[in-house]
Amino acid sequence: MTTEYLDFELPIAELEAKIEALRSAVGNDNKINLDDEIARLQKKSEELTKKTFSDLDAWQISRMARHPSRPYTLDYIERIFTEFDELAGDRAFADDKAIVGGIARLDGRPVMVIGHQKGRTVKEKVKRNFGMPAPEGYRKALRLMQMAERFNMPIITFIDTPGAYPGIGAEERGQSEAIARNLREMSTLKVPVICTVIGEGGSGGALAIGVGDKVNMLQYSTYSVISPEGCASILWKSAEKASTAAEVMGLTAPRLKELELIDNIVPEPLGGAHRNFDEMAANLKQRLLEDLADLDPLNAEALLDRRYQRLMGYGYV
């Protein structure tokens, strides 16, 4: 996959373009030896990338969370799990493609995996509704969670949505009810629930599959009640203030960890998750295995008590 660069990465992009040009020159003429120059530029590019990503602000992280090349739920399922068997439909209205889920194995152990799914091509984005689920998507997710509970399987969710779909049809079919029901039912599931924000964690649309015993965030993901643009439009009447809004919203992983709203921050490869899908998946898999090891000794009663105490601890100052 061709690397796409954001505007604050342009100096890095220029160096990478020079490296590719030198490699092409070597490929076209075997007599040319540019290994030393290529190595020098690679080292310079790596140092510049480290410097750039060591001090990203909240708005830059927000844009990283939305990066079009960022790995999505199905990318992680392919790399972390085996024997994935997708399950479809809410058994009431339709199969919402913005939510994917099914039974899989994590290191041989049966688990239920559920997550938001965006699209890359225009056709796929339309099919997945840009990762914005309708009520039937959340009802499908709940159906799979309840199935997991019946068969005593841990539940693993991947969160990556700008928010629940706000269309008229979704509201007519009970969008708010579907989200509220998921919040209630997830809080009482008698199996371990591990939630990870892998990109955008947008409002109730994210929270509807985000109530768990462990909540993780990828290093450059975000979690908030509204987008920076939406917040800026309300407070300053202009989306151009999005960068200011992002700073005051506290939507980054370090800030949410500081507030004890999440448990762990999963490190991303240098330059972001989209730079190395396999490395990112390996980091996330390790985190999931460690979380399961922490939760396995707890029986259903202990899980529910722990989850209740967690939820009651939210919102303090």
Swiss-Prot record:
<dbReference type="GO" id="GO:0016743">
    <property type="term" value="F:carboxyl- or carbamoyltransferase activity"/>
</dbReference>
<dbReference type="GO" id="GO:0009317">
    <property type="term" value="C:acetyl-CoA carboxylase complex"/>
</dbReference>
<comment type="function">
    <text>Component of the acetyl coenzyme A carboxylase (ACC) complex. First, biotin carboxylase catalyzes the carboxylation of biotin on its carrier protein (BCCP) and then the CO(2) group is transferred by the carboxyltransferase to acetyl-CoA to form malonyl-CoA.</text>
</comment>
<dbReference type="InterPro" id="IPR029045">
    <property type="entry name" value="ClpP/crotonase-like_dom_sf"/>
</dbReference>
<dbReference type="Pfam" id="PF03255">
    <property type="entry name" value="ACCA"/>
</dbReference>
<keyword id="KW-0444">Lipid biosynthesis</keyword>
<dbReference type="GO" id="GO:0005524">
    <property type="term" value="F:ATP binding"/>
</dbReference>
<protein>
    <recommendedName>
        <fullName>Acetyl-coenzyme A carboxylase carboxyl transferase subunit alpha</fullName>
        <ecNumber>2.1.3.15</ecNumber>
    </recommendedName>
</protein>
<keyword id="KW-0275">Fatty acid biosynthesis</keyword>
<comment type="subunit">
    <text>Acetyl-CoA carboxylase is a heterohexamer composed of biotin carboxyl carrier protein (AccB), biotin carboxylase (AccC) and two subunits each of ACCase subunit alpha (AccA) and ACCase subunit beta (AccD).</text>
</comment>
<keyword id="KW-0443">Lipid metabolism</keyword>
<comment type="pathway">
    <text>Lipid metabolism; malonyl-CoA biosynthesis; malonyl-CoA from acetyl-CoA: step 1/1.</text>
</comment>
<dbReference type="GO" id="GO:0003989">
    <property type="term" value="F:acetyl-CoA carboxylase activity"/>
</dbReference>
<comment type="similarity">
    <text>Belongs to the AccA family.</text>
</comment>
<dbReference type="GO" id="GO:2001295">
    <property type="term" value="P:malonyl-CoA biosynthetic process"/>
</dbReference>
<keyword id="KW-0276">Fatty acid metabolism</keyword>
<keyword id="KW-0963">Cytoplasm</keyword>
<dbReference type="GO" id="GO:0006633">
    <property type="term" value="P:fatty acid biosynthetic process"/>
</dbReference>
<dbReference type="InterPro" id="IPR001095">
    <property type="entry name" value="Acetyl_CoA_COase_a_su"/>
</dbReference>
<keyword id="KW-0067">ATP-binding</keyword>
<feature type="domain" description="CoA carboxyltransferase C-terminal">
    <location>
        <begin position="33"/>
        <end position="294"/>
    </location>
</feature>
<dbReference type="InterPro" id="IPR011763">
    <property type="entry name" value="COA_CT_C"/>
</dbReference>
<keyword id="KW-0808">Transferase</keyword>
<keyword id="KW-0547">Nucleotide-binding</keyword>
